[in-house]
Amino acid sequence: MASFIKAWGLVIISLCYTFFIAKLVPKGIKRLILFFPVFLIFFIVPFLIYSLHLLGITAFFIAWLANFKLLLFALGRGPLSSNHKPLSLPIFLAVSCLPIKIQLSPKPTKTHSHEGSTEGPLIYTIKAVFVVLIIKAYEYSTKLPEKVVLTLYAIHIYFALEIILAATAAAVRAMSDLELEPQFNKPYLATSLQDFWGRRWNLMVTGILRPTVYEPSLQLFSVLGPNYSQILAAFGTFVVSGIMHELIFFYMGRLRPDWKMMWFFLINGFCTTVEIAIKKTINGRWRFPKAISQVLTLTFVMVTALWLFLPEFNRCNIVEKALDEYAAIGAFAVEVRRKLTAYLF
């Protein structure tokens, strides 16, 4: 915990530096150069943390999201620059280092299938209970088929990530009264790969990859025409996402990458671009029934995840490390309760 506090203290100091630099230096190359030391610090910070959970959160929040947000901010773009008035320092710090984005437009009316998730505390409590049950099931992983264990990993990732992101957004919303954009949008209801990756799964990542990778690539390849530029930009976005996922697992496992996770995103990216091309060709003249599209989409994502993405958790011993941390937390809680009982009675 001490290493985590020191690491995040360094993060806060670095963000304060960028905040005040932006007051003095206009957007552009000069500001970008002055931000460069912060980019390096944010890539190094996860190495200072020993707890698997705190390391994973820091790698995602800081090494990936915060660095990408600051890159955009240096150029006068992104969530740190897109407000009508400059952000105050506390709001700047929150938006920089947390997976949140201020919703600028009024909350849309629920008139279509892509509205943000409106799940309440009860649903998140149920999901938290499922996470606890899954963690308990890991104790019997040696007796379960490998694919069953990997499927439990997938459910664990989805529920845990959704709970962490929703809790973070709820805390910021309660303290600042800001309206924030949703984090997930029922990815299990996706009707296509484009729908799953672009509109439903981990929308914070989608929202930061769009201005940092997709839109610049779209402009770069515009000489090839709108169809080819969109396909190449979409594929490039998956490439960058794959690299960042490999980096996060390198932080957590400290093992040389075998690039299977990269292949997961390359395959999903390639198939998504093929899907986009087919949609443009048929131009809405024919489509699968919605239920069949949902089953095919979820099946494809799960099959490729079971093949390439989820086995990386075993290779990096992430589950074993996580169980050790849960046991340590449980032992600490028992010790605290024992001391409190002895003190009070």
From Swiss-Prot:
Any GO molecular function: O-acyltransferase activity
Top-level taxon in the UniProt lineage: Eukaryota
Knockout or disruption consequences: No visible phenotype.
Entry membrane topology: Multi-pass membrane protein
Pfam families according to UniProt: MBOAT_2
Record's subcellular location: Membrane
Key word Membrane present: yes
UniProt EC number: 2.3.1.-
Keywords: Acyltransferase, Lipid metabolism, Membrane, Steroid metabolism, Transferase, Transmembrane, Transmembrane helix
Main location: membrane
Broad enzyme group: transferase
Keyword set includes Lyase: no
GO BP field: sterol catabolic process
Chain segments annotated as transmembrane: 1-21, 32-52, 54-74, 86-106, 120-140, 148-168, 231-251, 258-278, 291-311
GO CC annotations on file: membrane
Protein family according to the UniProt entry: Belongs to the wax synthase family.
Its job: Involved in the esterification of cycloartenol. Not implicated in the formation of sterol esters in flowers or during seed maturation. Has a substrate preference toward saturated fatty acyl donors (16:0 > 18:0 > 16:1 > 18:1). Does not require triacyglycerols (TAGs) as a fatty acyl donor, and is unable to acylate diacylglycerol to produce TAG.
Listed name of the protein: Acyl-CoA--sterol O-acyltransferase 1
Organism: Arabidopsis thaliana
Gene behind the chain: ASAT1
